[in-house]
Regions:
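N-proximal short alpha-helices
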Residues: 6-13, 20, 76, 80-87, ...
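Short secondary-structure boundary micro-motifs
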Residues: 2-3, 10-14, 88-90, 100-102, ...
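Short N-terminal secondary-structure initiator segments
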Residues: 22, 26-31, 36, 85-101
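A short mid-domain helix/strand-loop element embedded in enzyme catalytic domains
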Residues: 80-97, 104-124, 143-154
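Acidic/histidine-rich alpha-helical segments that form the ligand environment
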Residues: 92-120, 163-190, 200-210
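Short, charged, surface-exposed hinge/linker loops at domain edges
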Residues: 2, 45-99
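Short, contiguous alpha-helical
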Residues: 4-33, 37-56, 115, 123-171, ...
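Short, Lys/Arg-enriched charge-dense amphipathic segments
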Residues: 71-89, 144-158, 176-188, 207-221
Length: 230
């Protein structure tokens, strides 16, 4: 079965994003739609460990080529960040229970992958050409706080700053986040999100988690060849 893929352009078409509808977090951006598709395909092997952690390796391996099912204009943030910041037409309504459970299983796999990467990479990360860039702990903090203190507010969660940065706090956040999304998807919230939807929230949370996990892998000073010039 082909991989249902969406192309999202920024409002000024400065950058584009290609992402899979069926595999939350498998999403890459580039200057053009063609390059975004090429990069998405190049990340197929990098996404496989997440499918494996979710118990879906066989399904993922059987997936066919990328198939564009929608070509859309996103937001100004798409141009600025090269990231999808709005739901596609397929991600508008509530998810079925089976769809929700599948999405959450893959999101949990993304979390597990992030945690495993964070535990094995070097504390100091390879710097950029001008010597800038965050170290491991700052990447971890940013990733967790963005989800727990920003994304999760869309489904009514509010926690003190930094509360999810401890092991117990992170476990509690993830449990509460999933439950809040489940309740929201079931229609138990009176106040809808302004522009996001549950399918998008799951996809965006998985993407943000994996994007920074892959960043840590790419900048790991303990990885083979890490001391070679880039």
């Amino acid at each position: 079965m082909p991989v249902r893929t969406v192309i999202e352009h920024g409002t000024k078409d400065k950058r584009s994003v290609a992402f899979s509808l069926d595999w939350p977090g498998w999403s890459r951006g580039a200057k053009t739609a063609e390059l975004a598709l090429e990069t998405l395909e190049a990340y197929r092997d990098r996404y496989r460990p997440i499918a494996d952690l979710a118990g879906m390796a066989h399904e993922f391996d059987a997936a066919g080529p990328l198939e564009i099912v929608e070509d859309r204009v996103g937001t100004g943030s798409t141009d600025f960040w090269g990231i999808s910041f709005s739901p596609s037409s397929t991600e508008q309504g509530p998810m079925t229970e089976a769809e929700f459970d599948r999405g959450i299983t893959l999101l949990r796999a993304a979390w597990a992958f992030f945690d495993s990467v964070a535990a094995r990479v070097s504390p100091e990360m390879r710097k950029g050409p001008r010597g800038g860039g965050r170290d491991r702990d700052r990447i971890i903090s940013h990733t967790i706080r963005q989800e727990s203190e920003s994304f999760a507010t869309g489904v009514g969660l509010r926690i003190p700053e930094g509360a999810a940065l401890t092991p117990d706090g992170l476990r509690q956040h993830r449990k509460d986040y999933v439950e809040a999304m489940r309740r929201y998807n079931a229609g138990e919230f009176e106040k809808p999100m302004r522009s996001w939807t549950i399918p998008f929230l799951i996809r965006h949370s998985a993407f943000h988690t994996l994007d920074h996990a892959w960043e840590m892998e790419d900048k790991d000073l303990g990885a083979p060849g890490a001391d070679e010039p880039h």
